[in-house]
Amino acid sequence: GYGAGVYNAAAVTSAGARAWNEPAEESDIIFLGAMWTLDNWGEDMLALRRGEKINYFETDASVVPVRASVVDTCPLGNYVLVSPNDRHTILYGSQEFGTSAGAPINPMTVRWADQNDFREWTPSAANTSGEVLLTEGSSLIGAIRSRNAINLWTDQAMYTQTFVGPPFIFNFTQVGSNCGLIGTHACVDVDGVSYWMGDNNFYMYDGRVRTMDCTVRRYLFNDFNMTQKEKVYAGINSEFKEVIWLYPMAGSDEPNGYVIYNYEENTWVYGKLFEEGIVTVFQDRNTFNNTITIGRVSATDSMYVYNNEPNGIYTGNNKNLP
């Protein structure tokens, strides 16, 4: 049909050309995935599905488990984060103030609610809500809390966001160019040092942006499915002083490869997780005693949450996990 690949063109001049009533085998149209971001609001939780409104889960709302409720007064957004200390709820990529309810999201707008109130998004002299439109890049990709600041990335640049109080509330400083983030969850922070994956390199920020000397860079990016790059997931394994990135290798639509950087020894390793399995999330040991991953070990398996190496035993389904 229309809209997918070359239509009504001679096959001898256009590869993949189709005539009337010849369906396309595949589409060249790429849609963004349904990416979720979560953050704590005290003991409660804020959750955002990209392109929608914030959902609020109140843990003490009832003795019976309840569903999260939509924050109706919130604009549509792409990524949510709660600013430390000053407690502002921030959207990265948001509808701009003054636009209609059905207005599109401006992917370069940072917008925040009133202090301690994630329901009040209308700026006034009586509150601290506001917004800023950043300029370097075409879309805000992700953000993480770091030491005394929030570090945020577009597809082209890195900024720092610091709380300065009224009247501006936040100060935004561009600290790097040509160092954009490859995907929303492709960044981590370790003791005030941020590490992230770009479209063709790895970077760190310790007061200034540095390109990391990755010894496996060529092998990794030559075997990478860039159409699924937003699924890259970065995690920390603090016990072994490692940062791990899960990424989709060529031919896979889900993360099935990994690259690990040891920030204490300055070494790199990479490899394939499973022959047919995937791992989509890696969480450091904090709430639980071991690292937590989500994935499956074969194409026919269901997705599971893995408690890796429980009690120091390396057996069972955990044997194939990195």
Question: Which residues are covered by each model-predicted region?
Answer:
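Surface-exposed extracellular loop regions of Gram-negative outer-membrane beta-barrel proteins
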Residues: I150-G176
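Surface-exposed assembly/interface segments
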Residues: G1-V80
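Beta-strand initiation motifs
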Residues: A61-A68, R119-N127, P166-N171, T211-D213, ...
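Structural motif
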Residues: K53-E58, E96-F118, D155-F163, D199-G207, ...
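Residue-level marker for isolated small/hydroxyl-bearing positions within beta-strands
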Residues: L48, L91-Y92, W153, Q161, ...
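A short beta-strand motif characteristic of beta-propeller blades
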Residues: R18-E26, P65-D72, N127-L134, F170-G176, ...
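Beta-sheet repeat architectures centered on beta-propellers
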Residues: G1-Y2, A24-I30, A34-T37, S138, ...
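Surface-exposed loop and turn segments in beta-propeller and other repeat-based domains
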Residues: G1-E26, Q115-E136, T215-Q228
